[in-house]
C-alpha cells in the first residue's frame, strides 16, 4: 500500500478502514503498523495522529484495550491541536477504552470536559453519541441512553443499509429498548442488525448482535443464542467480545442452576478479559464467578504477574537494554506509548530503574 503512497497519502487510512470493515483485522493491523512507522519516520505529525487513530480502532476491535487507549490518546493529542473533526473519534475511542476498564466517572468527566461541538461529519457525530449512550447504559441511566441512541437513529436514518461493524447502534439500542420496557422495538432493532451483519458477512458484528439479542431472551433460547455467538466470535480476532459472550453464557447457566458449566464459562471469560486489559469487565466476571460458587484467583495488582501481555513484552525488551525508541520500532508503537507502558511497569513492579527491572524479569 505504501509503495505507491506514503503515510501522508489521501487514501491509505481509508484503505485500512475498508479492511477492518470487511473483518480482515490482521491485515488491517499490519497495514496500520506500517503507516504509523512511516509517519513517525517522516516526522509527519498529522499523518501520525491520523494513523494512530485508525490503529486505535483496530486495537479496540481486537480487544487490546491498553494499546487502543494509548493510540487513541496519541491521536487525540495530535488531532486536537489542529481542530481536526476526527479528534472527536479519538475522544470517543478513548472513552470506550475507559468503559472497558471500569473508569466510568473518569470517562464521563472526559466527555464533559471536552466541551467540543459535534463534528460536521454525521458519521462522527453518530459514533460519539453511541459511545455516550454506552456510557449512560453502563451507569444505568436508561433515559439518557435512550436519548443518545435516538439521536444516532436520526443521524443515520438516510444512510441506507450500512455495514454495522463500526457503528453497531441497532443492537445497543435494542438492549436499551428492552430495559426501557419496549420488547417489540428491541426485537426489531436487533433483528435488523443481525440481518445486516449476515448480509455484509461480518462475523464480529454478527456475534455482537447475537450476544445482545440473548440479553433480551430467557431460558434455553438465550443460552442457545449465546452458544451461537461464542461459535461465531471464536473464529474472529475480537477477544473481548468473545470474553463477554462467555461471561453472558456463564451468567445464564448460573441462573439456570447449571453451576459447574457456569463456572467453566465464566473462567474462560475471566481469562480473556484479563488478557485484554479490560479490568472493568474482568471485575464484573469475577463477581459473577464468585456468585456461581467459584473461587477465582485474585488478580495480581503488583509484581510480574500483574503485567499485561504487552507490558511483559515491553519489560522483557527493556531488560535486554533496548531503548524506548528501539522498543517502539520493534513493537510498532510510538515512543510515548512505550513510555506509558514503562510507567505502568515501574508502578506495578515498585521499581525506579532498568537495572532493577533486569533482576525481576530474569527471576
PLM ranges: what are they?
Residues 1, 15-304, 341, 363:
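Helix-coil-helix junctions within alpha-helical repeat/solenoid scaffolds
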Residues 248, 287-290, 296-363:
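Helix-turn-helix DNA-binding segment
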Residues 1-8:
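Flexible inter-repeat linkers and adjacent short helices
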